[in-house]
Each structure stands twice: as structure tokens, then as C-alpha cells.
């Protein structure tokens, strides 16, 4: 496997003239400027030092992205020939967007498809059914369809609007052996299958589950195995900013006893990952911070070698993880020429001080607070609760609100509910997992251990 990618020197050279990283630059560079930067980087013999570069956060990036997205001047090439990925809702409720060059995006999909095949996530003859989302600006369906096709599979691109009963019929009728979707969609379908008569469930020939976007809990994994039998569970890791970049495979890293972490394999020829102490989340300018040794957990910082026109350099993801060597067991699968380039990223999850995840989307607490505290809402106190359904291990989201009595200038209750539902990206397939509860007094909220403080976020899933 010889993945196409840019050199670190090329990526840093373009970053120097890009407004993501240079506040004196108004617009991203034109194609000729990018080409000149690449040629200069290739000719320069000086050592490339990533450690002298400042880190950027999501807030840093999207402050610039917001300006570029709304600037329709002819000189703003950010809006030209771009593939748009969306990420968690902004404070106004509409999704944030990251633009990638269209040709870069296609090449990235091809390279990652080869990586999936090299890691045996996909085998010759696999038939894959995907239930990923499309529409409402989501591109998950076309992304995963192309990735699996590039990896050598035959794909049934079913999407998220088919009912579980319809998906089941397609799985059975076409002898599909691989099911892929967001974690929430997978669990929704597995729950449907678990309710069917045994003889109907036996029509399925599934050998693999490949989930994306959100980790499966231990209860969810057990539910899958109890329903489908001894099936392999794989995963794909990616983001709007970096695209897909790692795969989770028990064949490579072994079955995990601890489900509070998930092991992923990534290729250092396409993605550089540094791990920093958690203290960088609280430092205004963590330039002096140094990466922790391999094996120690900390904040994941990414530099993509597949993003050039809009580079991703030392991006603080807010995720917690650690980097490890591949275990020896992986030699049976990984080619010798690739071995030295692959690493294990052990993902511990999101830094829960700053965000939470529901139905494959991250929500920043800062943005939730801005929504709840906006003028005219009349919200005196609020709380977000993650839980699971009693009938299945699907994750639910409840928003509890204590509101001032109706007065002049307040939004109507209906308008407020509509605004909150828009913020949390409600779709037909997750509406039944969402609830807004208006409480009469402070007693309607979950309290801290001392019983005096209302907790803004309660997670009953862990």
C-alpha cells in the first residue's frame, strides 16, 4: 500500500499563507500560490519542525470559517469547488461547515478505501448495506458508500429513511453480510431484529457490523451479540475537519475487555497525531506544552497530510486518547511494507468538560448554554440528560427547562421548542429518542451529590 499524501513541509508551507493560521491573511491562497508554496517547500532543505507551530481549537477554526463562509467576494476561494462537511450545531442552531477541495476529498476517499482493504475491514466478496444519513446537509451516505466501494465491496446504499422492517428485508433478500451505520442506527435495527420470531432472524447472514460516529456501550455490544450471535464488530473514525482516518478492528488489536476505551489503527503517512497533557485545554496559549510519551493518555492533536487547500495543522480535537504500537498479532494481516507506518490510537472519549455526543453529533456545552441563555427564552434553569430506553439500549436525550411565567417579550413555548429541536438536529429516525420537559420548580432537576446544585449535564449511560 502506497497512500497518496502531501509532505508535512508542503502542508505547513500552505498553512503559513492561510487565514486559519495567519491572521494577516484575508483569504485562502489561490491555486498558483499553493503550487508556489509546495515548490518552495520541496526545494528548501531546512528541517521541518511541527513543534514550533501553535495549536488551534475548533473555536479558532470556526471563527475564521464563519467569516469565509459568508464572504461572497470574488477573491474568496474558500467557497469555490468545495466539498462541505457539517459538524455539531453552532450557537445559532445551524450546523457549522468545513470545506475541503473536491479533488482532495475524492483522493482521500480512494486512499482510505485502500487502507480499509489492507486492514481487512472489507474482504473480497463482501456485500455491505449502509443506513447512513443523507439530506439536511449530511453527506454520510455518499461518503460511506464510496469508501466501501473503493475498498472492494458491493454496496446497497439504503440510507436513513428506510424503516427497520424494510432494511431487514433487504439484508435477508440480498444475502448481505456486512451492516454499517451510525451507532444509534445500528442499535435501532438490532432492536427490531431482536423482536422478530427466531426463524425470521435466522434468515440473516451477517458476519460483520461496522459502526461510525459514536462508540457502542457494553450493553449495546452484548445486545448485538445476543441477537446476531458471534459477529465481528468493527468501526471507522473520522471528523468533518480531517475526514475518515482510522479503523477499529478486533482482528488487529484484539477484543477489548474495557469498553471505556476503543482501539483504532491509523497510518502515519496520512495523519500525524500528537498527545498532549489535558492542561492544554485550560491554557490560553499552550505553546510551551510538549507531547506526552507513547502510551500515556491526553488530548489528541491532529495534523492531516491529506488536506492541503484548507490545511488541518495541530488541531486540538478535544478528544482524549493515547498512541501505541501495533500488537504482534496484527502481523498476520498487515503487509510488512506498511507495518512501520501504522499505529494504534486508543480513544478514551471526549473531554466531557466541554461537550457531549448524541446520535452521532457532538454538542459543545458553550453553544448549548448560549442557546438556553438567549434573550427572550425566559429560561431560568436547564439540564441535559442522556439515558437509555427501557426497551432497548438506544441512547435518549432529555432537555429539562424551568421557565419564567409568560410576560411581554418572551418567545412562545412553541417557538422555543422549535428552536431547541432545530439545535439538536432532530430527524425522523431520532425523534422518539428526544424529549423536552418543562418543570414547575427546581425540584424537577437532577441534583449533585450534595443535593444542592443543579447539574447541567447528567449521563446515565455510563
Provide a role label for each language-model segment.
Residues 51, 56-208, 212-227, 234, ...:
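Active-site phosphate/ATP/adenylate-binding loop shared across adenylate-forming ligases
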Residues 2-17, 160-462:
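Active-site glycine/GP-rich loop and adjacent strand/helix microenvironment
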Residues 1-118, 123, 396-400, 406-462:
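Nucleotide 5′-phosphate-binding alpha/beta core
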Amino acid at each position: 500500500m502506497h497512500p497518496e499524501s502531501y509532505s508535512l513541509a508542503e502542508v505547513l508551507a500552505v498553512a503559513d499563507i492561510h487565514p486559519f493560521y495567519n491572521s494577516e491573511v484575508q483569504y485562502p491562497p489561490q491555486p498558483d500560490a499553493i503550487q508556489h508554496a509546495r515548490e518552495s517547500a520541496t526545494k528548501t532543505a531546512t528541517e521541518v519542525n511541527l513543534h514550533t507551530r501553535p495549536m488551534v481549537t475548533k473555536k479558532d477554526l470556526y471563527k475564521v470559517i464563519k467569516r469565509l463562509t459568508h464572504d461572497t467576494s470574488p477573491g474568496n476561494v474558500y467557497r469555490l469547488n468545495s466539498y462541505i462537511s457539517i459538524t455539531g450545531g453552532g450557537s445559532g442552531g445551524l450546523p457549522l461547515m468545513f470545506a475541503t477541495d473536491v479533488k482532495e476529498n475524492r483522493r482521500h476517499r480512494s486512499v482510505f478505501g485502500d487502507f480499509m482493504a489492507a486492514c481487512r475491514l472489507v474482504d473480497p466478496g463482501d456485500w455491505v448495506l449502509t443506513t447512513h444519513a443523507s439530506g439536511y446537509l449530511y453527506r454520510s451516505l455518499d461518503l460511506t458508500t464510496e469508501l466501501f466501494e473503493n475498498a472492494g465491496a458491493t454496496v446497497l446504499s439504503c440510507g436513513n429513511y428506510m424503516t427497520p422492517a424494510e432494511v431487514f428485508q433487504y439484508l435477508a433478500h440480498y444475502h448481505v453480510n456486512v451492516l454499517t451505520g451510525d451507532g444509534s442506527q445500528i442499535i435501532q435495527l438490532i432492536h427490531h431484529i431482536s423482536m422478530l420470531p427466531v426463524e425470521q432472524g435466522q434468515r440473516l447472514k451477517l458476519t460483520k457490523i461496522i459502526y461510525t460516529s459514536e462508540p457502542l456501550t457494553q450493553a449495546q455490544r452484548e445486545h448485538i451479540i445476543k441477537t446476531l450471535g458471534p459477529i465481528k464488530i468493527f468501526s471507522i473514525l473520522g471528523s468533518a475537519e480531517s475526514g475518515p482516518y482510522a479503523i477499529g478492528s478486533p482482528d488487529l488489536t484484539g477484543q477489548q475487555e474495557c469498553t471505556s476505551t476503543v482501539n483504532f489503527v491509523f497510518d502515519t503517512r496520512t495523519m500525524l497525531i500528537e498527545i498532549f497533557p489535558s492542561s492544554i485545554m485550560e491554557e490560553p496559549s499552550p505553546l510551551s506544552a510538549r507531547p506526552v510519551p507513547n502510551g500515556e493518555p491526553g488530548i489528541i492533536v491532529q495534523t492531516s497530510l491529506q488536506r492541503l487547500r484548507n490545511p488541518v495543522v495541530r488541531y486540538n480535537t478535544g478528544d482524549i486518547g493515547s498512541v501505541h504500537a501495533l500488537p504482534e498479532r496484527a502481523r498476520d494481516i498487515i503487509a510488512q511494507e506498511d507495518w512501520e507506518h501504522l499505529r494504534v490510537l486508543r480513544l478514551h472519549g471526549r473531554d466531557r468538560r466541554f461537550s457531549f455526543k448524541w446520535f452521532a453529533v457532538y454538542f459543545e456545552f458553550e453553544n448549548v448554554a448560549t442557546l438556553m441563555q438567549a434573550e427572550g427564552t425566559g429560561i431560568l434553569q436547564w439540564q441535559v440528560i442522556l439515558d437509555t430506553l427501557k426497551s432497548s439500549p438506544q441512547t435518549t436525550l432529555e432537555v429539562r427547562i424551568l421557565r419564567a411565567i409568560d410576560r411581554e417579550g418572551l418567545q412562545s413555548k412553541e417557538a422555543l421548542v422549535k428552536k431547541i429541536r432545530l439545535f439538536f438536529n432532530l430527524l425522523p429516525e431520532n425523534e422518539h429518542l428526544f424529549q423536552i420537559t418543562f418543570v414547575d420548580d427546581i425540584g424537577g432537576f437532577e441534583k449533585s451529590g450534595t443535593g444542592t446544585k443543579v447539574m447541567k449535564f447528567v449521563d446515565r449511560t455510563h
